[in-house]
C-alpha cells in the first residue's frame, strides 16, 4: 500500500448567492482518468455524515428544522478544502524544513478523517434506513390519497345517483298516494251510491235514475281504477241482483198502479151513483120542506083561532108576571109575605084547575102536531147520518188525491169566511133562542133549526178534516220533494266532481250520458204533466241540469220558497187550530145553551102543567103566540132564503166535484201514457245494461293483463333496488374499513415522524460540535498559509494527477435540471414554497491569490414543469430531509443542462447497489489511490434505473386507470 499523496481542492469565492459554477480546467480537459481518480478519492476520503439531505422529486428541501435550514453547507466544503490544502502545503514544506512535523500533522488529520468516516458510515446507514422507511410511507400516503380522492369522486357520483333514485322513489310514493286517494274516493262513491239506492228504492223514477247512475259509476270504477278489479266484480254482481229486484219491484208497482187505477175508476162510478142518490135525497128533502110549510100554514090558521084565547091568557100572564115579580121582591124581603102569596097561589090553583080541563083538549091537538114534527126530525137525522158516512168515505178517497192542495187552500179561505158568517149567524140564533125559551112551540121549531145548523156544522167539520188531511199529505209531499232536491243537489255536486276528475277516461261514455239526460228530461216533462203544482220545481231542476253553476242560487231560492210555503202552512194550521178551538168553544157553548134550554123546557113543561090550570093565563099566552107566529113566519121566510143559498152552494160543490173527477180521469189517462213510455224506457235500459255487461267483461280482461304487467314491473324494480342497496351497503362497509386502516396508518406514521424529528435534533447538536472543531482547524491552517503560497500551485497540480477519480451519483430523471455538490445539504433559506430555488454557495477562498484551476458550480433556473409539480406536493413533504448523491460531467466546460448537477434519491442508489451485488457499505469504505478505480454508477446504469422507474410509474398509472374504469362501470350498472 503506497501512501496517499496530499491533495487540496481549491474552490474560488462565490460570485453570487444564486448560482455557483463548477467548470473543469481547460488544460486538463482530455485526461478524464485524472478527474475520475480525484472524484473517487474525494468520495472515499471526505464523505461527511452530516452533509447529505434528502430532496423531494421537485428539488424541495424536506428538513423541517429551522436550525438546519440556517446551516450553510458550502462553507463546510471550504473548510474541508482548506484543511486539505493546508495539509498538502504542510507536507511540501516538511520536505524542505521539517518532515517530521508535517508527518505528525498528516497522521493526525488522517486519523481524524478515519474517525469521521467510521462515524459517517454508521450515521448514514441509520439515516438511509430511516429515509427508506419515510419514502415508503410517503408512497403509501400518496397512494392512499389518490385512492381517497377516487373514492370521494365515486362517493359523489354514487350520492348523485342516490339522490336521483330518492327522487324517483319520491315520485313513486306520490303516485302511490294519488292512487290511494283515488281508491278512497272510489270507496266513498260506493258508500254514497249504496245510500242513494236505499233512499230511492221506494220511488219508480228515482230508482231508474239511480240504476243508470250506478251503471255509469261501475263503468267509471272499472276504467279509472284497474287495481280494484275484485271489488268492481263484487259490486257489479250486487248491483245486478239489485237491478233484478228493482225490475221486479217496478213490475209490482205497475201492477199496483193498474189496480189503483181500476179502483179509482170504480170509486168514480160509485161517486157518480152517490151523487145521483144525493140529488134524489135532496129532492125528497125539498118535498118534505114543502109539506112542512103546508103544515106550518095550517098551524098558523090554528094559531089565529087560538090567538083570541091566547090574548086573554097573555093578559092574565102579564098580571101573573107582575105578581111574580112582586112575590120575588117580597120573598127577598120577608118570609111573611111568602106565606100570604102561597095562600093566594092556592086560591089561584083552584081556579086554574077548572081552566086546565078546557085546555087539555087543545094541548092534545098540539101534542099530535109535535109528534108529527118529531117523526120528520128523525127522518132528517137518518138522512144526515147516511150523508155523514158517505162524506167519511169521500174523505178517505180524497186523502189519496194529493194534487188538490192549492184549490183546497182557496176553498179553505172561502170556508173560513163562511164559517165566520156562520158564527155570526149562530150568535144571532143564540139571541133568538133566548127569546124563544119562553114558549115551547117556538123552542121546538128553533131546536129543529138548530139541529139543521149542527148538521151543517158537522159537514163543515168534515170538510175541515178533509182539508187537514190534504194539508198533511201536501206537507209530506213537500217534505219528500225537499229530500229529493237535497239528494239531487248532492248527487249533482258529487257527479260533477267525478266528471271533472275522469274526463279523459269517460269520453266514450258521454254519448250515453247525453241519452240519459234526454231520458231524464222526458221524465221531467212527464212529471210536469202528472204534477201541475210542481211545474216550477221541475223547471228549476232542468235549469240546474243545464247550468250547474246556477244550481246553488236556484236551490237557495227553492229553499226560501219552501220555507215560505212552510210558513204559510204553519199559519194555515194555526188558523185551522184557532178555528177548531173557536168551533169547539161554540159547540160547548151551544151544548150548554141547549142543556140549559132543555132544562128550561122541562121547567117550562112543569110550569105549563101547572099553568094549564090557569086558563086565563093561557088565553093571554095564545094572544102572545099569535103575535110571535107572525114573527116566526117572517123567520121562516128568512130560513127559506138561507136554504136556497145552501142549495146553490150544494150545486156549486157538485160542479166542483165533477171538475175534480174530470181532472182525476185526465190524470189517470196521462199516467197510463207515462207508464207506457216508462215501459219503453225500461226495455231500452235493459239493452243498455246488456251492453254494459259486455263492456265490463272486456274491461275486466284488460284490467287483469295490465295488473299482471304492473306487478311484474314492480317486482323487477324491487329486485333491482334490493341489489343496489346490498351493493351500496357492502361498498360503504369497505370504505369504512379502508378509512379505519388509513387512520391507523396515519397514526403510526405520525409517531414515526415524531421519533425521526427527535433523532434529527440530536444529529444537529452533534453537527454544531463538529463545526466548532473545524473552526479551530481553520485557524491553525491560516497561520501556515502565508509561508506556502508560492509552492502551492505546482504541488496541487502534481497531486491532482495522482489522486483517484470518484463518481458522484447522478439520476437525471428523478429530479431534472438541478445540480448539487457531493455531501452538501440542500436547505431552503426562507424562500416561499412556490419559488423553491436551491442556492449553492461556493467556498470562500481562504488564500490571498486566486487559483488558476477551479470548478464553477451553476444552479439552473427551475423549469415550468417543476413549478407545476411543486404545487401538488403537500406541505409536510416539503419539510422532510432527503439525501442526494451528485455526479459531475467532467468533459464539458459550459454550465448547460448536461453539465449541471442532478439529484437521485438515496433509495434508488441503494437498489442499484444491491442489483450490482455491491453492498452499501462498500460505497463508504476508505480506499487508497493505488486501487483500481471502481465507479459505482455508470451512465448506462443510471439510464436503466430511470427507465425502470418510468415503467413502474406507468404500470401504476395503468392499474389506477383500470380500477377507476371498473368502479365507474359498477356504479353505472347499479342505476341502469
Swiss-Prot record:
Primary gene name: SYCP1
Motif Mediates head to head self-assembly of N-terminal ends, residue range(s) on this chain: 101-111
Matches recorded under PANTHER family: SYNAPTONEMAL COMPLEX PROTEIN 1
Keyword Thylakoid in record: no
Region feature (Required for pH-induced assembly of C-terminal ends into antiparallel tetramers): 676-770
Name used for this protein in its record: Synaptonemal complex protein 1
Assembly mode: Structural component of synaptonemal complexes. Homotetramer that consists of an N-terminal four-helical bundle that bifurcates into two elongated C-terminal dimeric coiled coils. This tetrameric building block potentially self-assembles into a supramolecular zipper-like lattice to mediate meiotic chromosome synapsis. Self-assembly is likely initiated by local proton density at chromosome axis, which is predicted to trigger antiparallel back to back assembly of adjacent C-terminal ends into tetrameric structures that anchor to chromosomal DNA.
Domain remarks in the Swiss-Prot or TrEMBL record: The molecule is in a coiled coil structure that is formed by 4 polypeptide chains. The N-terminal and C-terminal regions exhibit a prominent seven-residues periodicity.
Tissue: Testis.
GO cellular component: autosome; central element; chromosome; chromosome, centromeric region; male germ cell nucleus; synaptonemal complex; transverse filament
Motif (Nuclear localization signal): 117-120, 679-682, 880-883
Effect recorded for residue 679 to A: Impairs pH-induced C-terminal tetrameric self-assembly
Effect of residue 717 to W: Enables C-terminal tetrameric self-assembly at pH 8.0
GO biological process, one term: protein homotetramerization
Function: Major component of the transverse filaments of synaptonemal complexes, formed between homologous chromosomes during meiotic prophase. Required for normal assembly of the central element of the synaptonemal complexes. Required for normal centromere pairing during meiosis. Required for normal meiotic chromosome synapsis during oocyte and spermatocyte development and for normal male and female fertility.
Keyword Transmembrane: no
Keywords tagged on the record: Cell cycle, Cell division, Centromere, Chromosome, Coiled coil, DNA-binding, Meiosis, Nucleus
Main localization of the protein described in the UniProt heading: nucleus
One annotated GO molecular function: DNA binding
UniProt-annotated location(s): Nucleus; Chromosome; Chromosome, Centromere
Spans annotated as Interaction with SYCE3: 206-362
Pfam families the UniProt entry points to: SCP-1 (PF05483)
Segments forming a coiled coil: 211-316, 391-439, 499-685, 739-798
DNA-binding: region residues: 784-976
